[in-house]
């Protein structure tokens, strides 16, 4: 059993992984993190900071309650404030034995028009002409117009960009990958595709790309 993704979700941990039977799962779990404060009690466990201060573990309730308690606490508080890592440490100690055969890896590539020059990622101003995605032995290409694909590629012919994006989203949501990769996908394909979907179909449609039904923007460099 191993995890593939752990994210904070309000007072919950959003967990995706593979169980002992090799089946993918996802669930939301309540989690109360442990942080550490200075202690002079001799009976406390021998936890120490890097500079030698003796500390004891404390629980202040839910993740939101813990963050509020840290703000109000008068002294130093030690530990991770990104609680997804605390959850991993608590529930998956030691080395995690991953089975790569059970991890769904999607390779993605998009093609855009360039009528007005190179597409602007933020504005998503150019039409998406094609999307190709390969996951395991399943290789699909979504596009408009006639195309004679190689034997190993399934071609989904669409009448316009709106249908192309919709077909892609529906297939994606029927079998969410664990890892998404591709050439320059982090800096172009994924952010451009997300912004283009929001522009053409709306944010509700873009939310379907997430197994949890929501997404947030991050600056990458």
Task: Label the model's feature ranges.
Residues 1-221:
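The two-metal-ion catalytic cores of nucleic-acid processing enzymes
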């Amino acid at each position: 059993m191993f995890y593939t993704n752990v994210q904070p979700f309000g007072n919950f941990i959003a967990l995706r992984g593979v169980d002992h039977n090799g089946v993918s799962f996802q669930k939301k779990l309540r989690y109360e993190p442990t942080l550490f404060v200075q202690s002079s009690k001799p009976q406390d466990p021998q936890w120490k900071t890097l500079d030698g201060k003796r500390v004891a573990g404390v629980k202040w309730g839910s993740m939101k309650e813990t963050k509020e308690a840290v703000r109000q606490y008068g002294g130093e508080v030690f530990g991770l404030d990104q609680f997804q890592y605390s959850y991993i440490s608590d529930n998956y100690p030691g080395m995690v034995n991953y089975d790569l055969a059970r991890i769904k890896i999607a390779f993605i590539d998009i093609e855009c028009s360039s009528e007005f020059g190179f597409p602007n990622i933020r504005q998503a101003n150019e039409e998406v002409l094609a999307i190709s995605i390969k996951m395991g032995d399943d290789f699909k290409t979504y596009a408009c117009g006639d195309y004679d694909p190689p034997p190993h590629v399934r071609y989904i012919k669409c009448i316009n960009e709106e249908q192309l994006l919709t077909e892609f989203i529906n297939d994606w949501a029927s079998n969410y990958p664990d890892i998404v990769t591709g050439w320059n996908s982090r800096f172009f394909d994924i952010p451009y595709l997300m912004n283009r979907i929001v522009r053409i179909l709306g944010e509700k449609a873009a939310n379907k790309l997430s197994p949890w039904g929501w997404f947030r923007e991050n600056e990458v460099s």
